[in-house]
Amino acid sequence: MSKIKQVIAREVLDSRGFPTVEADVILTSGVMGRAAVPSGASTGSHEAVELRDGGARYMGKGVLKAVANVNKIAKKITGMEASDIRLIDDTMIALDGTPNKGKFGANAILAVSMAVLRAGAADKKMPLYDYIRKIYAIKEKNYLLPVPMLNIINGGKHADSGLDVQEFMIVPNVSKSFKEGLREATEVYHTLKGILKAKGMVTAVGDEGGFAPHITKHEDVLKTIMDACKKAGHSQIKLALDCAASEFYKNGKYTFEKKQVSSKDMTKVYSSWVKKYPIVSIEDPLHEDDWDGWLHITKELGKKIRLVGDDLFVTNPERLEEGIEKKTANAILIKLNQIGSVSETIDVINMAHKAGYACVISHRSGETEDAFIADLAVATNAGAIKTGAPCRSERNAKYNRLLQIEQELGKKASYAKTKVFKK
């Protein structure tokens, strides 16, 4: 296997126009791997540190410090075998020396981690998903193409729509293939645009490509999406929510539709929606540290739908272990930059699978054209992926990569569909 010859980093722009870190890893064979990391808007307080420069430049969001830190990392990993990804990741983590990557920044470490894997795959002339599976000894016989969870109406921190809930998603979980599922969901998306226009509503899109109409009642959104599914001829499509409830929680209460309510009140709201609408998944329905509330909602809804922990778990093994012990939630959202290295991410996925928790591979609201997570989803047989609406190139880059993978694998792969979501 070739060794690392050179590591180069630079500041590039993400989909929101703010800087992020891109890294190139060049091997002695001459091949190169390149990766750019994403950035979140609504972030869990337990996430690894995304190092920013501060000051006036780019409104304080520059990443020149993180870029400079990649140069420090380069001195330690140059000469290492590209296939020794765990050793490389461990070396970077040890070099940082903090529990949350606060010294070098998760954005610096992750960019290198991803780029090393890309370089290794190129060196072996293997697709990235195959290489990830081999290098981490992932014991899966077949390949699953993930069910896409498409965020078609944005609220919360992703838009100025006035909605508390951050994402309203559609889930084509009974389609014949990924290709067909994406087509059906895309037809619903465009039908929804027509419905909103007919009602005189704005069809501008939010950070993740979903529409951001000024609707104040959440049930009105659910009804409108159901109308779009029916009108598009795809009434079999299911719904999912990302509530990002930590964003509307303060002093033990949730400010929901301009009322102060408790976690039990919120659970009643969600339960009523699950009865009325074909909702198969709710992400972050409660605050990230509201363990009692999470336990209650898991007892109420855990056998009916997916309850996905994002801010609750932040792709962190210690947080996930606590959730497993407390029997809270039944699924975890996987975001590479929450933990800050690919090796640690794989370990969390393995832990979740072993405990019977479902995994959803996810983008961030501040994305790049890098489609690494598409390969990650297929490599790990996660079965589900969240990467926005079928709009904006940084979102479609992931969907297009999955279309390529589905074609490459042919009969070796199947679409996850009802194996993953049941309702």
Swiss-Prot record:
Recorded metabolic or biological pathway in which this protein acts: Carbohydrate degradation; glycolysis; pyruvate from D-glyceraldehyde 3-phosphate: step 4/5
Binding positions for (2R)-2-phosphoglycerate per the UniProt entry:
Q166, K335, R364, S365, K386
**From the Swiss-Prot or TrEMBL record, what is one GO molecular function term?**
magnesium ion binding
Listed under catalytic activity are: (2R)-2-phosphoglycerate = phosphoenolpyruvate + H2O
> In the UniProt record, does the keyword Hydrolase occur?
no
Name of the protein described by the UniProt record: Enolase
Top-level taxon in the UniProt lineage: Bacteria
Provide the residue positions that the database annotates as binding Mg(2+).
Answer: D242, E283, D310
Q: Is Lyase one of the keywords UniProt gives this record?
A: yes
Source organism (scientific name):
Elusimicrobium minutum (strain Pei191)
- The main place the protein resides is cytoplasm
Cofactor list: Mg(2+)
**Xref: Gene3D superfamilies:** Enolase-like C-terminal domain (3.20.20.120), Enolase-like, N-terminal domain (3.30.390.10)
Annotated cofactor note: Binds a second Mg(2+) ion via substrate during catalysis.
What InterPro entries does its record include?
A: Enolase (IPR000941), Enolase-like_C_sf (IPR036849), Enolase-like_N (IPR029017), Enolase_C (IPR020810), Enolase_CS (IPR020809), Enolase_N (IPR020811)
Family annotation (Pfam families): Enolase_C, Enolase_N
Alphabetically sorted, this entry's keywords are: Cytoplasm, Glycolysis, Lyase, Magnesium, Metal-binding, Secreted
SMART domains in the cross-refs: Enolase_C, Enolase_N
The record describes the protein's role as:
Catalyzes the reversible conversion of 2-phosphoglycerate (2-PG) into phosphoenolpyruvate (PEP). It is essential for the degradation of carbohydrates via glycolysis.
- Similarity remark: Belongs to the enolase family.
Q: Which GO terms describe its cellular component?
A: cell surface; extracellular region; phosphopyruvate hydratase complex
Q: Which GO terms describe its biological process?
A: glycolytic process
In short, the EC number is 4.2.1.11
What is annotated as the active site? E208, K335
**Localization:** Cytoplasm; Secreted; Cell surface
